[in-house]
Amino acid sequence: MVLDRIKKVNDIKQLNEEELEELQEEIRDFLVENIAKTGGHLASNLGVIELTMALHLSFDLTRDRIIWDVGHQSYTHKILTGRKLGFVTLRQYGGMSGFPKTQEDPADAFNTGHSSTSISAGLGMAQARELTGDNYYVVSVIGDGALTGGMAYEAMNNASRMKTNFIIVLNDNQMSISENVGGMNQYLNSFRTSDAYLDLKDGVTNSLNRIPVVGERMVKRIRNAKSGIKQLFVPGMFFENMGITYLGPVDGTNIKEIRKVLAEAKRVRGPVLVHVRTIKGEGYLPAERHPARFHGTGPFDIDTGVPLYHQEKAHYTDVFSTVMRKMGEREPKVVAITAAMADGTGLKRFKNLFPERFLSLIHISEPTRRTPIS
């Protein structure tokens, strides 16, 4: 097996294209087989196998830093850094963590948790790099769910203001920021990151700024005209308008295409966002059909995807669901609030019985809901 040759960071770079194709399928099979026994986050990890491989092929994790937002999608990253054997004890006491841990491996750049922290953490590392005069890449990988958290936007706002070289990878497995516009989009991506374009852009701006009185005004008008043209062709103008260069969207199942865009991102001066479209549960049909069920799962039957529950043990979520139902029936003033996770929190039954008393947040926006409650 090709997977058996991955013992440490950068071993993946010794593989040819055929072996890389074999490896991605072996990792997919490995994850399904092992998580079926131990439980864990399956759907999200199956969706980022190719993205993670592309990141490891594009960067040197003995030096460069990759921060995974939330971190539950870092299983392939753990495999590619030589921790395959640790999956026997995944998420068990004394075993391998289901999230990045700096104590576990030097390639885990940041102890992540829930949620929306990766861009801030990456920005801090990028600033530290500038202050110490070091030379390495910093990459923050954030999902579309975590991108709904206000902290992420605060960090992007600061990144654009500081003009620090910094790469953000948007792992988009749900929302549609934009549609791929084909050849024109690819052309614009490559053109805007070419050395000739970047040098010309800086040269023209500096020259115009030196013209007395009218120079700055001319630069502003050119920028406004350029922005208007880009609105017609370039997706992700939300990020562009924040001062963050946008590249993508790119097919998250195509390692070659992801590597190509990451190479372009390395050439950008200042913050850049790479938009990667992935599919939760990719390659395992039960997880593709029911990604929410396989977001965080216990042991399950591989052939059917059906959970292997131990009937003698009561699950906390089930007990909570029953208690909430009884409280809702007994007390009409009880209101249930969840962060867009009715299934995972055991509130789906309450939602169905008392829809008018069920409030769901818009993804990662707990502060916005908790403050009015107080």
Predicted feature descriptions by range:
Residues 1-79, 240, 251-259, 275-276:
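N-terminal amphipathic, basic-rich helices that act as targeting or association modules
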Residues 19, 24-31, 40-48, 233, ...:
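Cofactor-pocket helix-loop regions in the catalytic cores of large enzyme subunits
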Residues 41-162, 316, 327, 332-339, ...:
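Cofactor-binding active-site loop characterized by glycine-rich and histidine/acidic residues
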Residues 174-320:
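Long, well-ordered, tryptophan-enriched scaffold segments
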Residues 76-82, 147-156, 178-183, 189, ...:
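Short acidic, glycine/serine/threonine-rich loops at helix termini
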Residues 86-96, 161-173, 196-199, 359:
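A glycine-rich helix N-cap at a beta->alpha junction
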Residues 70-75, 142-148, 170-176, 253, ...:
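Acidic, glycine-rich active-site loops and adjacent beta-strand->loop/helix elements
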Residues 362-374:
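Single conserved hydrophobic/aromatic residue that forms the stacking wall/gate
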